[in-house]
Amino acid sequence: MGIAGFEITVLADQSKTDGYEIFQQSGPAGTGPSPHSHPWDESFYVISGTVLCGVGEEESLATPGTLIHVPGNTSHWYTFGEEGGEMVSMTSAGNASEMYEDLARSDTDRSKFGAIAGKHGQEYR
């Protein structure tokens, strides 16, 4: 599903895993979510390209093979690098897949993202 210029594919949702969820995410250069937080933990494993990531006050450039872990309720963001990128992400108990589906239905209107994500426990900063 497309969300604000990048793609998210649900590989496994909580109905299949008893809680955690797994996603494939990819996008062209410059795409990615703005700073946000949510109650669930999230980890990203970069497969290709580069991804500039911010977690709390730390910022790093993730290359293939890099794992980034984001504890729940921690502000974070990422932007796909110059050649775009691809990664696999996993969330702990939460409803990220439902939130992504709702965001995809918003026709990429970012002005609606805060209210939509808020219904799922996510807050944009």
Regions found by a protein language model. Name each.
Residues 1-19, 105-125:
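A short, N-terminal "cap"/entry segment at the start of jelly-roll beta-barrel domains
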Residues 16, 45, 50, 57-75:
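Short acidic-glycine-tyrosine-enriched beta hairpin
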Residues 8-10, 22-37:
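Conserved short histidine dyad/triad with adjacent acidic residue
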Residues 19, 37-39, 80-82:
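Short glycine/proline-enriched turns and hinge-like loops at secondary-structure junctions
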Residues 16, 52, 72-97:
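Ligand-binding loop in jelly-roll beta-barrel domains
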Residues 90-110:
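A hydrophobic/aromatic-rich effector-binding and dimerization subdomain
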